[in-house]
Every structure is written in C-alpha cells, then in structure tokens.
Amino acid sequence: MENISVVRLLLKLSPPVMLALLIQSIYNIVDSFFVSRYSAAGLTALSIIFPIQLLMTALATGTGAGINILVSRMDGTGETKSQADIVKGGLFSGFFNYIIFACAGLLFIRGYFSISSDQLPVQEQGIQYAQIIFTGSLGLFIESNCTKILQAKGNMLTPMIAQVTGAVMNIILDPILIFGMFGMPESGVAGAALATIAGQFAAMIITLTAVFRIYRFQGKIRLHNCISIYRAGIPSIVMQSLYTLYIVGLNLILKQFTEDAVTVLGIYYKLQTFFFIPLMGLQQVILPIISFNYGAGKSKRVKDTLRYFRELTVGGQVFSSPYFARSFCWFLWHGFFIMRG
C-alpha cells in the first residue's frame, strides 16, 4: 500500500474487483431472463423489488466501507492490536443489519407492493420473492463486511473468487429451481430468490473463512467500535439510499402510464451497471489505499490516488460513452421484447 506507485497499485488491484462486478452484472441479467421465461408478472415484480434490493446493498456495502476505512487506517498508523475488535464489531454489525432489514422488510413489503402495482399476480409474486430475499439476507450482509475487511488488507482475489462463485451458483440454480429441473419442484420466482440466497451464502462462507484465518475472531464486540463503523460508513449508505428513493419515485410515476414502463426501467438499471463497472471497481480499490496512507500521514499519496482515480475514470467514461450508448440502446430495446416473449 505504501511502496508501490499509485498507478501500478490501482492497475494491480482493480482487475479482480472489476471481474467480480462483471460476473455479478451478468447474473442480474440472466436472473431476469429466466424469470421472464416463467412469468411476465414475475419480471415486473423483480423490477419493482430491485430498488429495495439496492437499499439492502447500500446498507451492506456502506457498513463494509466503514470497516474498510477503520482497518486500513489502523494498518497505516501501525495500530494492529485493536483491529480484531473492529472486525468482531463489523461482523456483529452485519448481523444487526440483517435483523433490522429483515424485520422492517417483512413488515412493510405488502404495503410497498400495494402502492407499486395494481396487478394482483405482480403483487403476489413480488411479495413471495421479497420475503425469501429478506429472510435469507444474512449471507449478503456478512459477506459484504468480510469482503471489505479482506480488501482493506489488500486481498482483492479472495472476494473476487467468492463473488464469482456465488454468481455462477446462482446462474446454475436459477433454471433448476424456477422451472423444476432434475427432479426439483417448480418454484417460479421463489426459486429465483432461493438461488440468490444460495449464491450469497456460498460467497459468505468463502470470505468468512478467509477472515477467520487472519483474525481467528479473537476480538471483542465494543459499542464504540460499532458506532465508529457506522459513522465512517454513513456517507456511502446515505448516497446509495437516495439513489434508491429516486428509482422508487420513477417507478411510481411510470406506473401511472403502464407497468411495462416499470419493467423497462428495471431492465435499464441492470444493464446500466455494465457501463459503471470500471468506476465502481476503482472506487472500491481507492478506499483502502487512501485510508492506509491517511493513517500513515502520507498526504501526497492520498492526493495522488484521488488525482489518478479522477483521470482514469473521467477519461475512460468519455472515451467509452459514444460506443456504449448505441449498443446499450439497441440491447435495451431488443432485450425487453426478448424477455417479454
């Protein structure tokens, strides 16, 4: 984190993160495709629940970012003794997030779908999908925190393996559980939800095992550490949550015209992820680099990291936008009709 040049560090650490994000983006599209083959109402239901899943991800990744910042900063200052306490507090925070989100989600999901759709099949399938996702979201919250802990230590490979494993498992299980293949019962959208949960738990097991090898979970859960984690992660949580509210607002507006528009919007945001993979990959990489060097008092490397990040992302987006826009619009238009049959 301190001896390699900033540019080399960014280019070395970013590819595994970007590959994991690419696989996850592909899985999102494949997931929607299989559901659309089963039921058009199911595809609309997934588009409606998508912003709530983003909210769940915002809480998970935001909390993980808080852990990442604290662990990297401690590495920079040489304060390693209390890292185990931060890690233990981070894992507890993941479990706490799960309890809060699962309870709130199960309590309010029926009301959310009642205002988001007037079609009974969409409501029923959406509620069924959401209940499974919320109940089994422990894997997402723990995996996200473990991933950020490993990234804080400069380990980008294990999180990539975990996320790719989870996504591939999800893609394989989707048709089996949705359509009832190989002797499995036909589960429809519930099968898609179960496949998602299975993939998340597979990723959690891989990252949790890697974290255990480093810390052996010897720390103690301390309230002030948990508060520090949320304080460091709250900007990320709030910004991503506002994006979720924006999509929910658009869905409510589009619903007044036709629910097909809501479906198209959901497909659009899943496709849009491909365009932002380089940005999101670099964003995840610079967090531990900046935190480490800030803790070590190396302000020049902090400024250099921000400068190179800005140059790489702006340059990349400007260069790729003209080529991406045309193919993106074509795929969105044709992809909607392919998915709807």
Residue ranges and their predicted role:
Residues 13-21, 54, 94, 133, ...:
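Residue-level signature of transmembrane alpha-helical cores of multipass secondary-active transporters
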Residues 157, 168-204, 326-334, 340:
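Membrane-interface helix-loop junctions in multi-pass transport and translocation proteins
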Residues 8-68, 72, 234-256:
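Signature of the first transmembrane helix
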Residues 43-106, 140-159, 265-330:
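Small-residue-rich hydrophobic transmembrane alpha-helices
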Residues 120-145, 273, 279, 339-341:
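Alpha-helical transmembrane segments of multi-pass membrane proteins
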Residues 1-12, 189, 193-196, 205-244:
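Interhelical loop/hinge segments that connect adjacent transmembrane helices in multipass membrane
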Residues 100-131, 321-341:
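Short membrane-interface helical motifs at transmembrane helix boundaries
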